[in-house]
UniProtKB/Swiss-Prot annotation:
Gene: htpX
Transmembrane segments: 4-24, 37-57, 158-178, 198-218
Similarity comment: family membership: Belongs to the peptidase M48B family.
Membrane topology recorded in Swiss-Prot or TrEMBL: Multi-pass membrane protein
Cellular localisation: Cell inner membrane
Protein known as: Protease HtpX
Organism of provenance: Tolumonas auensis (strain DSM 9187 / NBRC 110442 / TA 4)
Entry note: cofactor: Binds 1 zinc ion per subunit.
Known cofactor(s): Zn(2+)
EC number: 3.4.24.-
InterPro entries per record: HtpX_protease (IPR050083), Pept_M48_protease_HtpX (IPR022919), Peptidase_M48 (IPR001915)
Length: 291
């Protein structure tokens, strides 16, 4: 979930910034976006722009946010094992060798990110490396490699771009309706009305952006099942089931809720509707039913 939450947070921030830029351009250069055709076009440009920028920044943001130390040259036995395992799995799936990194965390987590399946980043926590068996860790790595091979981040970007477009479009339309309803020609200047329109549209974008994230989360859950299946094909489903069962036994004692939502595991107080990963028991059941 770490890569998804980081992507969504970056996307929301970028989208809000781009929306502010759009409003400034509209005010200073007289660019009208209130017509349905022009508004939809601008919503698409800024909506997809936000998700694409988030994708391009994903590796940099992940490294910076979690202090990922990229393995340039393995220096220990465990680093050699990690590097060689990722290299072997990358060759098996036909992708370019990803950057391999480790970040310091007691939580048993891993994530993959990057704008290109041939230039991705696969990072694992120190907690995973030192608390899982080699077979379990190998299955986790195969899960992340499957995400890269399946192009999940690019597909997520396209879906997020569509969602952003409709969020911006609907927010601006509703903001126009509300601001016109609230406006009094006798009491309010056009400048004040423009400020009200801008403020209302920002509120709507924030609210609808959070609600629309359920669509992205649903997509993410489906891709998790697929990545689990990909891992099972690479290393065997018994290893992947063992890794998930290890997470089920260990994740209750990990970090607080804000951190436990990350990685391939994650306990969260939110309902499944807002979860990027299916419950562990459902993932295990799906693997057991694989033929």
């Amino acid at each position: 979930m770490k890569r998804v939450l980081l992507f969504l947070a970056t996307n929301l921030a970028v989208m809000l910034v781009l929306s502010i830029v759009l409003s400034v351009l509209s005010s200073f250069f007289g660019i009208s976006t209130r017509g349905s055709g022009g508004l939809l076009l601008m919503a698409a440009v800024f909506g997809f722009g936000g998700s694409i920028i988030s994708l391009l920044m994903s590796k940099w943001m992940a490294k910076r946010s979690y202090g990922v130390q990229v393995i340039e040259q393995p220096r220990s036995e465990i680093e050699y094992w990690l590097f060689n395992t990722v290299q072997r799995q990358a060759q098996q799936t036909g992708i370019g060798m990803p950057e391999v990194g480790i970040y310091d965390s007691p939580d048993m987590n891993a994530f993959a990110t990057g704008a290109n399946r041939n230039k991705a980043l696969v990072a694992v926590s120190s907690g995973l490396l030192y608390n899982m068996s080699r077979d379990e860790a190998e299955a986790v790595l195969a899960h992340e490699i499957s995400h890269v091979a399946n192009g999940d981040m690019v597909t997520l970007t396209l879906i997020q771009g569509v969602v952003n477009t409709f969020v911006i479009y609907i927010s601006r339309v509703l903001a126009g309706i509300v601001s016109n309803f609230m406006r009094s020609d006798d009491e309010e200047s056009s400048a004040t009305g423009g400020i009200a329109y801008f403020a209302i549209s920002m509120v709507f974008e924030l609210i609808f952006g959070i609600l629309a994230s359920t669509i992205v989360m649903w997509f993410s859950r489906q891709r998790e099942f697929r990545a689990d299946a990909g891992s099972a094909k690479l290393v065997g489903k018994d290893k992947m089931i063992a890794a998930l069962e290890r997470l089920a036994r260990g994740h209750d004692s990990q970090l607080d809720g804000s951190m436990m939502a990350f990685g391939i595991n994650g306990k969260t107080a939110m309902t499944e509707l807002f979860m990027s990963h299916p419950p562990l028991e459902k993932r295990i059941q799906a693997l057991r039913e694989m033929r």
